[in-house]
Amino acid sequence: MGKIHRPRRGSLAYSPRKRAKSIVPRIRSWPKDSEVRMLGFAGYKAGMTHILMIDDSPGLTKGKEIFVPVTIVEVPPLFVYGIRAYKQGYLGLETATEVWFHDLHKNVARRIKTLPKNYNEEAFQAKLGQLEDLVNDGEIADVRLLVHTQPWLIGLKKKPEVMEYAIGGDDVKAKFDYAKEKIGKELRAGEVLHEGELLDVIAVTKGKGTQGPVKRWGVKVQFHKAQRAGKGRHIGNLGPWHPARVMWTVPQAGQMGFHHRTEFNKRLIAIGENGKLVLDGNEIEITPKGGFPHYGIVRSDFLMIEGTIPGSFKRIIRVRPAIRPPKKKPPVERPQITYVSRESKQ
């Protein structure tokens, strides 16, 4: 008799498979980076195309022309609206104080309903000075940036997304000086990300509603004779007699998609500006003929990321520098691109 080997269907690592709390993904871990910069960026997924490039990664095809599918993420400038400072608490970092910029865009009130009233530049400078005193006294353990997106710049919508980003470096004073310089200003993707570096992509996947166990967990469709009882796309049984309950490990129907996911080590092929990519000294439009399906025209800055990423078109996508890069990684520079497909994706 042959070896009986039937591993369970589906991974329990992602259980419970339920909808994400928010469509704006969370980043709870940050890489260590010696460079003082904002550790990541955010944008909106436009669609996919493909390119031909000279492979510069270590491997059999190095130096040869290869086909690479890429995802385009439009990244209008982020606005730094605040600084959040943390102190060292008993169980880890605790919020110490925040400083918000005094002159915010009117659309921010659509997202933040509790904007401070009677808050002018004088009050802003006073709070900023108080925070600087805390930093100089050594009471602050970390400084991070509070930013919001500006989707109205690309004609997507009016309500922005707000989020927090860590700052690279080891010196808290250097982090504060960087935050002090950037507050109240726009940040573009080219200022904080480098072409060729590896990124982690964090997003909420496409929602697929309620699905059965075959599609949701990958269980086998039952043998045709077993289907004579009436159905075949279900599990054979719900488990043993004892323990006298249905265990949570049993693959059953339920919610599929709209899950919070992180995909590691996606290479940033190129960064474009104003919807255009510089190729061999010439500017070419990145938008394909007829526009990206369900999205339209890319008008602002964009990221060209290798491979696929989670989420549907127009969904908010967050990236950060790779937190666990491989030992053999490609050089941090733009690879030589020989062709970009602009054929219709309709």
Curated annotation (Swiss-Prot):
InterPro entries named among the record's database cross-references: L3_arc_euk (IPR045077), Ribosomal_L3_dom_3_arc_sf (IPR044892), Ribosomal_uL3 (IPR000597), Ribosomal_uL3_arc (IPR019928), Ribosomal_uL3_CS (IPR019926), Transl_B-barrel_sf (IPR009000)
GO BP annotations, alphabetical order: translation
Transmembrane segments: none
Keyword Transcription regulation: no
Keyword check for Transferase: no
Stretches for region Disordered: 324-346
Keywords: Ribonucleoprotein, Ribosomal protein, RNA-binding, rRNA-binding
Quaternary structure note: Part of the 50S ribosomal subunit. Forms a cluster with proteins L14 and L24e.
Function text: One of the primary rRNA binding proteins, it binds directly near the 3'-end of the 23S rRNA, where it nucleates assembly of the 50S subunit.
Protein name (Swiss-Prot/TrEMBL): Large ribosomal subunit protein uL3
Organism whose genome encodes this protein: Thermococcus kodakarensis (strain ATCC BAA-918 / JCM 12380 / KOD1)
High-level lineage: Archaea, Methanobacteriati, Methanobacteriota, Thermococci, Thermococcales
Gene transcribed to yield this protein: rpl3
